């Protein structure tokens, strides 16, 4: 007799609050059983085992005294994955090896869940996370993008800056931190100043993405779920004078409002997501 497949696995981390909790509550109301897996707690606080043999394969994990058999999992929400939280006194050579082995073990565990419905599959997410691929696909389907330069050449960056009369912002291609609040070394989207490019030798160690600065009226955050849009909007005039990135504002009154996307824009974003299979 097989266990009932009524569990929805929520893949996240211990610093994730509110959103994942709301999703868990909604799942419970609809009769499903949410199982939260904080990936950063593996391997120190999460136990996992995979048994492979001629008689069959078994995969299970235990987290916060809750036991999960993969046969119980009906669907997976891949929200966030964090690296393991390991002891600070662990020798660097062992630390890197432990992280690598732990991440690889979790990758194998995800494979055991391939029969479940994923939102979204890790392979598709990894393909879609490439910013240059995002920009190329956006162009192909008719979305407007800002003029963009990715380089580790200081002279190219200076020429780009001058060509746009200083209206340039800079960001990384990948996040240094995966939390909304970032960390002590988090880098926000920032406006480029001329003095930043006087001595840009450090660019040779780390290529960055430079983009034309577009004056903002609203900042939109769009959640897309199977053709449905859930859009939050910020009034950019509340923070544009003090910061380029809304996450840096000190305005405690900054609030999100519901927003309706223009039909043509919604259609193109829908096509954009289909291109990535999301």
Question: Language-model features: where?
Answer:
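Extreme N-terminal starter segment of soluble prokaryotic enzymes
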Residues: 4-9
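Conserved N-proximal alpha/beta basic substrate-recognition cap immediately N-terminal to
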Residues: 3, 14-30, 35-144
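Phosphate-binding site of ATP-dependent enzymes
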Residues: 27, 157-158, 163-267, 272
